[in-house]
Every structure is written in structure tokens, then in C-alpha cells.
């Protein structure tokens, strides 16, 4: 696996969900993210992934509902983002199955 540029950032993003509150906006990075993550379990957190739009900005923002549920990890971290299975995220937001 390539560990430079966006690829390295993706691994940090998937392994440490608490950092993802810096990236709570949905962006057009869907395909690049999952091109690096497909078929892998980068770290032992059940492949948690943070998505959602921050309302209010920064750490104080709250994610808008995208008909997704809060995972138990969300409550444990008490951070303003959704953590869901990346396969579900891919299906719902990337439209690639």
C-alpha cells in the first residue's frame, strides 16, 4: 500500500476517528478514500468511520442527520460526528455498492 499523500491521510483518518472532527464535511474524496480502504482492516476499531456535516463549525459543531444512526463509539468519544461501517458509508454516499 502506498503511504504517501492522500493514502497516508486516509489511514490516519480511519484509525483515529477523533481526528475526523477536523474533516466533518462531506467532500468529493469518496472514491479516493475507498480506493485505499477496500478489502483492508487498517486498525482494530471495527473500521469506524466519521461522516456528517458540521453545523456551527469546529469541535462545537453537530452533524446533520443523514438518516444514519449514532454508533456506540460516538457516545464514548462524545465527538461531533457519526461513526459507521465504511461499507455502509460507501453504499449510502458513494453509490458504488
From Swiss-Prot:
Keywords: Signal
Signal sequence region: 1-21
GO cellular component, one term: mitochondrion
Name of the protein in question: Uncharacterized protein C23H4.05c
Organism: Schizosaccharomyces pombe (strain 972 / ATCC 24843)
